[in-house]
Amino acid sequence: MWVTLCPAAAYRSRARQPAAIGIWRALRRPLFVAFVLGCTMSLITSAGLTPRLAGSATVYWSFVPLAEMVGLAAACGRGGRTLAFPRAIDLFFAGHGPWLFWLIGLSAIWSFTPPIRAFALTNAIWLYGAGGVALVWSAYIDFCFFRFALARSMARAGRDLVLHRLISWTIILAIFGGPAIPPAVAARLGW
């Protein structure tokens, strides 16, 4: 929670702490992100948390944290590395608070409101309003990660943030929207 509320101070402090961590500690936060995504899908589709839906959705939505780790590897691999990569993964995923809160809110809307009202709330208010806030706040947190945890200059931290987002979001969009993108592009081009 500290990283979500005070990312600069949190990353400054946590980056100085000695931590040789193992693979489990490096992967626990990405696995938690995948788990929250899986639970969100279960709650949206059935208005209930069922192990069958949440478990399978966790597995197939695990590409999101994997894509983020690919982007993180590319951004961390540029220049000198100040943190071991497992530690960088753990610290980076500690900053996923805005997106996790957004997903929990989305789940609550779909679980506690009728479908017609849920569509209205998620289209106008939640996707654009709260989603925009989560996007901007998470970008700031990620910038603080690159700036303070990896000890980068402001310009370098900004470039690393853009590189990470470009790589990870391109992978996520290609996997999630891949089947729908070519027909939509063809329709816009009049093919």
What do the PLM-derived regions correspond to, one by one?
Residues M1-D90, H96:
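Selected alpha-helical membrane-embedding segments in polytopic membrane proteins
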Residues S42-P51, I109-I116, P179-A180:
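Juxtamembrane "helix-exit" motif on the non-cytosolic side of transmembrane helices
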Residues S56-V64, A124-L135, G190:
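Alpha-helical transmembrane segments of polytopic membrane proteins
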